[in-house]
């Protein structure tokens, strides 16, 4: 690409969501309510898992990390979106844009790896119940968590450094956050290296974890079908239903947007799809896990009863 129109960009302008000005206050209240719901819902899961000893198991260890990731993932974009909806100049500093991109990639990738760990945990619990505590040892759980955090950190740093070396011809981003693909379209510099890394790392970070999840559940189904029973089928749905719902929500939108892009995709359509996995999915996850999970509902009742006894004393 030519660099004749290259300018020094100190800030970017985020065009935000395609909302009619007359409806801006209504959508602001809606998004604020969704963000508060996301924060409170995920915090509730984290607190319940910490307070209730019955939930001190590998599955809920991964779930608490997933809730923390959802909380942070939503917080990367939502506060700035809400601020810009009330601002006449919806801008973000250059350094702030790169920082937002880094944490967006970090927590988005972390969720992908945590979903894999949770799928493996369900696979071991159903297919090897007698050896579950031996296989899912504290050492293995800790190793899976550390590996997830380290790999996502490396991936986010790599893309951020590659983006920081680029020069930009314009500073108007047709999005509500600093999306990597939107930033590349504004670059004057050669972006071939960035695009190659996105293609390769996209396969490693998204496709491989997704295939591992599918493989885990394929083996679970295969194991159940070998000894078909109503109890076995109910066990699969009760223990895996919530996780499969979250996997479908997350990967359905991400793969549809980034790995299966359509030439007919408009900016508005891409923005709406991005809202699905950055705002809607983190908000729905606590409801999916709490409403369909007897352990979580039981933990909530025990904590409430414990507080009532404390206050009565």
From Swiss-Prot:
Residues the record marks as carrying a glycan: 5
Gene3D superfamilies: Rhodopsin 7-helix transmembrane proteins (1.20.1070.10)
Membrane topology, Extracellular segments: 1-25, 80-100, 159-195, 260-271
GO molecular function: G protein-coupled receptor activity; olfactory receptor activity
Database matches in InterPro entries: GPCR_Rhodpsn, GPCR_Rhodpsn_7TM, Olfact_rcpt
Membrane topology of the entry: Multi-pass membrane protein
Transmembrane segments: 26-49, 58-79, 101-120, 140-158, 196-218, 236-259, 272-291
UniProt signal peptide: none
Coarse class of the protein's main subcellular location: membrane
Swiss-Prot/TrEMBL keywords: Cell membrane, G-protein coupled receptor, Glycoprotein, Membrane, Olfaction, Receptor, Sensory transduction, Transducer, Transmembrane, Transmembrane helix
Domain of life: Eukaryota
rRNA-binding keyword on record: no
UniProt subcellular location: Cell membrane
One term under GO cellular component: plasma membrane
Cytoplasmic topological segments: 50-57, 121-139, 219-235, 292-313
Pfam families referenced in this protein's UniProt entry, alphabetically: 7tm_4
Keyword Cytoplasm: no
GO biological process: signal transduction
Protein's job: Putative odorant or sperm cell receptor.
Family as reported in the entry's similarity comment: Belongs to the G-protein coupled receptor 1 family.
UniProt-recorded name of the protein: Olfactory receptor-like protein DTMT
């Amino acid at each position: 690409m030519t660099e004749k129109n290259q300018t020094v960009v100190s800030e970017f302008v985020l065009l935000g969501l395609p909302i009619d000005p007359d409806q801006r206050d209504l959508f602001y209240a809606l998004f604020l309510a969704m963000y508060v719901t996301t924060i409170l819902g995920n915090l509730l899961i984290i607190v319940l898992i910490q307070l209730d000893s019955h939930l001190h198991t590998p599955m809920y260890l991964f779930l608490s990390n997933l809730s923390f990731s959802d909380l942070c993932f939503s917080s990367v974009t939502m506060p700035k979106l809400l601020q810009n909806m009330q601002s006449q100049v919806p801008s973000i500093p250059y350094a702030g844009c790169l920082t937002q991109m880094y944490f967006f990639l970090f927590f988005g990738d972390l969720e992908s790896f945590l979903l894999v760990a949770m799928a493996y945990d369900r696979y071991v619990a159903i297919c090897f119940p007698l050896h579950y505590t031996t296989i899912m040892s504290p050492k293995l759980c800790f190793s899976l968590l550390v590996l997830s955090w380290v790999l996502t950190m490396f991936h986010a740093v790599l893309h951020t450094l590659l983006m920081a070396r680029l020069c930009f011809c314009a500073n108007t981003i047709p999005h509500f956050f600093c999306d990597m693909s939107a930033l590349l379209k504004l670059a004057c510099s050669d972006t071939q290296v960035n695009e190659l890394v996105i293609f390769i790392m996209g396969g490693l970070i998204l496709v491989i974890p997704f295939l591992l999840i599918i493989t885990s559940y394929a083996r679970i189904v295969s194991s159940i079908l070998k000894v078909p029973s109503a109890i076995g089928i109910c066990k699969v749905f009760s223990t895996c239903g919530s996780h499969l719902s979250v996997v479908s929500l997350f990967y359905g939108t991400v793969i549809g947007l980034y790995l299966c892009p359509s030439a007919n995709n408009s900016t508005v359509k891409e923005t709406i799809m991005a809202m699905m996995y950055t705002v809607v999915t983190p908000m729905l996850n606590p409801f999916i896990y709490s409403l369909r999970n007897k352990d979580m509902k039981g933990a909530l009742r025990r904590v409430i009863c414990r507080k009532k006894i404390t206050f009565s004393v």
